[in-house]
Amino acid sequence: MFQSSIYNKNYKKFLKNLKYQGEYAVTLGILAISILLLTGFNQFLNTKPTLKKNYFLNQKSIKNTLKNWNDIIATTANKYKVDEKLIKSIVYVESSGNPYAKSQSNAIGLMQIKPSSAGAEVYRLNGKKGRPSIQELYDPKTNIDIGTSYISFLQKKFISIKNKDVMRYAIIVAYVNGTSALLKTFSKSRKEAINIINTMTKKSFCTHIKKNTRQCKHFVI
């Protein structure tokens, strides 16, 4: 009777330890999977500060992926009277067609929209308060609509630039760095800056903005 009691206690203790070990193993397994998922997710979303990280492995993959957005781009380009090729070029260079791209400066999605700048500006122009959420900007249709609307705004802002190729590059640089940052490289006066730009060829304009020369080459369309 005494031995049976000891046996039962030891058996229960054994079962308890076995259950604990099992739960511990399951917990470790879940933790390991979670770490792998988070690591992959962070690699998928994040980019380096100075160089956009392409999620896709080669240009062929990127171009195939860009085809996914052709219909949205065509519809949105027609809506805002913006060249489809310009939109595609920005998507290609800014995100490689990855709708979940996110930079450390909080530029989001296919056209790398910053909620606090381009996003808020487009909202203001459309009579809306606030700014788009990050989740909204991960949606390809919303992202392309806001990005193209912002390009349309820049087209109107630079309408006085006579050379259309130069105007296109001015729009691209302003899209990436901001209008004020672009114009201030020429003059503190907006009018004077535009006058200087109007004396330039596409090549001399790109030479002037040396820090954006590589981007200009990427955007040749």
From Swiss-Prot:
UniProt-listed Pfam families: SLT
Top-level taxon in the UniProt lineage: Bacteria
Catalyses which reaction(s): Exolytic cleavage of the (1->4)-beta-glycosidic linkage between N-acetylmuramic acid (MurNAc) and N-acetylglucosamine (GlcNAc) residues in peptidoglycan, from either the reducing or the non-reducing ends of the peptidoglycan chains, with concomitant formation of a 1,6-anhydrobond in the MurNAc residue
Class of this enzyme: lyase
GO molecular function: peptidoglycan lytic transglycosylase activity
Gene Ontology CC: one annotated term: membrane
GO BP annotations, alphabetical order: cell wall organization; peptidoglycan metabolic process
Swiss-Prot/TrEMBL keywords: Cell wall biogenesis/degradation, Lyase
EC number, as in UniProt: 4.2.2.n1
Family the UniProt entry places it in: Belongs to the transglycosylase Slt family.
Known role: Murein-degrading enzyme. May play a role in recycling of muropeptides during cell elongation and/or cell division.
Name under which the protein is recorded: Membrane-bound lytic murein transglycosylase E
Source organism of this protein record: Buchnera aphidicola subsp. Acyrthosiphon pisum (strain APS)
Gene: mltE
